Amino acid sequence: MLKVAINGFGRIGRNVLRAVYESGKHQQIKVVAVNELAQPEAMAHLLQYDTSHGRFGKKISHDQEHLYVHHDSSEYDPIRILHLAEIELLPWRDLEVDIVLDCTGVFGSQADGQAHIEAGAQKVLFSHPGASDLDNTIIYGVNHETLKDEHRVVSNGSCTTNCIVPIIKVLDEAFGIESGTITTIHSSMNDQQVIDAYHNDLRRTRAASQSIIPVDTKLHKGIERIFPKFSNKFEAISVRVPTVNVTAMDLSVTISTNVKVNDVNQTIVNASQCTLRDIVDYTESPLVSIDFNHDPHSAIVDGTQTRVSNGQLVKMLVWCDNEWGFANRMLDTALAMQASSQVEQ
């Protein structure tokens, strides 16, 4: 049994805990603690009731020291609640934590990870792109087999790299990618404003529900970290749209061989049924963003939107639930980190 602690109980932290149970991985993963500055009542309420994902199927209760996830009227899992701002004070050693899932969105350096380890954790997995000096950055399904036991501080990348990198891998292996551009069409996030208010980014001073808002993105850097050969070969832009969840990615790549639309789509179908099963999905149904809410895949390709120009310019539309898909990959990566330790032992 892998013992994990969740540091930060916001959108991703709560989805990670919920995914442990909804994916059936509670047979492999035990959440022993959650560290969050908010009050237990609010933590329990937001875990039980979620605007995007609906009610959690497990009953949640709490006291001042624990969350309780109930299996039935008599069986439940207690999860220790902590309210500590300093990593160094966290009791990971006493709780025998194997991996900290750091979902704060604040910490992300090798030093931050080392602080968790010095507090007693064996390893750390960040829920966002970390600094370049981390031991590894994993996009599950693409490079998780590179994990080694000595990789103690690891990043799970971002929701958008988890979405687009598997598709880039498939296209490159099949056709050879020369260059590409990406437009991320991302749902609103909690760094935006409900009504106009101050923010360091002037575009994000504007009400999230009233505009399509361009924001900065480092997605191309995330691609380069996984595929160094694509250094300076990809560019990306991102806009936020007035929806609460689900992201669409408009991918355009120039390839080195001549293809037709069916060639591209069939390559994705083959990958979704084999090497990237449970990571990539494919659809030709006339769906819209809400239909991908709570979808556990990293990427879902809409084959009806695939286009090919002049044989070598390929455009694709790729969907993802930027919360739920990513939370499920956090669990996959954590289990892969555990497996890497067992192999080398």
UniProtKB/Swiss-Prot annotation:
Keyword list, A-Z: Cytoplasm, NAD, Oxidoreductase, Pyridoxine biosynthesis
Alphabetized InterPro entries for the sequence: E4P_DH_bac, GlycerAld/Erythrose_P_DH, GlycerAld_3-P_DH_cat, GlycerAld_3-P_DH_NAD(P)-bd, NAD(P)-bd_dom_sf
Chief site of localization: cytoplasm
GO cellular component, one term: cytoplasm
Catalytic center residues: 159
Domain of life where this protein originates: Bacteria
GO molecular function: erythrose-4-phosphate dehydrogenase activity; NAD binding
Residues annotated to bind NAD(+): 11-12, 322
PANTHER family: GLYCERALDEHYDE-3-PHOSPHATE DEHYDROGENASE 2
Family that this chain belongs to: Belongs to the glyceraldehyde-3-phosphate dehydrogenase family. Epd subfamily.
Subunit structure comment from the entry: Homotetramer.
Name this polypeptide is given: D-erythrose-4-phosphate dehydrogenase
